[in-house]
Design a protein with these regions (language model features):
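Bacterial N-terminal signal peptides
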Residues: 6-16
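A cross-kingdom marker for long, charged
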Residues: 260-322
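Short hydrophobic "helix-edge" motifs at membrane interfaces and signal-peptide entry regions
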Residues: 8, 57-59, 283-284
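Structured, acidic catalytic/metal-binding patches in enzyme active sites
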Residues: 25-265
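Boundary at the C-terminal end of the N-terminal hydrophobic targeting segment
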Residues: 16-22
């Protein structure tokens, strides 16, 4: 149970959408990407070695902002020279505000909801013949049995498939932030992080329309069929400061999150909290480092757009100096 919970919460850090699947595909409304529209003047290739950096500053403080991938290879290699230099003497390192878990008594409710999601026998038995063939081929390539996907819920099947796909191809949502946190703590730099309670969102999964859940499952299946090529290419672009190339990464889960009751409010809260944390870091003279997922960082009404709206100075990777 602990492992299943961990997998579900990991996927929900960027995803969500479910409900019982129909025997034949149902035409759902299109999924909306909350970060589809970017602030184009912020999408600039970095001129320094390694990944691209933005800055947010006032009269006596600079926050160096590193936009990080939402999905990347585990233990991804990147040029850390600029990061290491900025870590020295930093007031704080703000990690991505993407941590989600069931807190306190909410863990019990989350566990009960998960049991409901994991009931119903092999998921593939509920699929139309054409989709069943695709799904069976995908799970067999991952080395998994039909029993492994025991659920009547499209989201639960999609989450499990996504987790298995990521594990098989050694992809993660936590790098490079995990390495940055380790280096910051080793250097004695205070780490700022935030964890959200997944309980309410997990309950909302069960109320999401079946057609939307099916569409999310289809997107995950298509990603598993396509393989990790897009993600690996985007990761290489990110490591070289090619912001436009890095933005080509998969967007399955972010669109699904918006379809869940409360999903838009949750996305709004994470962006607002990230912007507020950067603004608070400016209250102390000196400099700090912040990591923010790349698209939420650069989107219209994203983190940098909000900070510019507060009158703070934002510079692009084409302007940032060492």
């Amino acid at each position: 149970m602990r492992m299943i919970v961990a997998l579900l919460l990991l996927a929900l850090a960027a995803l969500a959408a479910p409900a019982a699947v129909a025997q034949t595909p149902v035409a759902p409304p299109p999924l909306v990407d909350p970060d589809a529209a970017l602030v184009e003047e912020l999408v600039v290739t970095g001129r320094l070695p390694g990944p691209a950096w933005w800055t947010v500053s006032d009269a006596d403080t600079t926050v160096y902002v590193l936009g990080v991938p939402s999905l990347a290879p585990k233990r991804m290699q990147w040029d850390r020279a600029i990061f290491d230099k900025r870590l020295q003497g930093a007031n704080a390192v703000i990690l991505p505000f993407t941590n989600i878990r069931a807190k306190g008594v909410g863990a019990l409710g989350a566990g009960l909801n998960l049991l409901r999601l994991r009931a119903g026998g092999p998921f593939e038995a509920r699929l139309d013949p054409a989709t069943r063939v695709r799904f069976v081929a995908a799970r067999e390539r991952l080395g998994e049995s039909a029993k492994h996907y025991s659920t009547a819920n499209a989201l639960a099947a999609g989450v499990q498939l996504a987790a298995d796909y990521r594990e098989r191809h050694e992809l993660t949502t936590t790098d490079p932030a995990k390495l940055v946190e380790l280096l910051a703590r080793r250097s004695g730099v205070p780490v700022v992080e935030k964890t959200y309670d997944i309980g309410p969102l997990l309950g909302a999964i069960l109320r999401t329309p079946a057609a939307t859940g099916r569409l999310c499952f289809e997107e995950v299946l298509a990603q598993a069929e396509a393989g990790p090529g897009i993600t690996l290419q985007a990761a290489r672009a990110w490591a070289s400061g090619d912001v436009a190339g890095a933005l080509e990464n998969e967007r399955t889960y972010e669109r699904c999150l918006m379809a869940v009751p409360g999903g838009r409010q949750f996305d709004e809260r994470m962006k607002a909290d990230s912007a507020a944390a950067i603004a608070r870091a400016l209250e102390r003279p000196g400099h700090a480092i912040a990591l923010v997922p790349l698209r939420p960082l650069l989107a219209e009404r994203g983190v940098l757009d909000r900070l510019r709206g507060q009158g703070l100075k934002v510079t692009t990777p084409g302007e940032v100096a060492e």
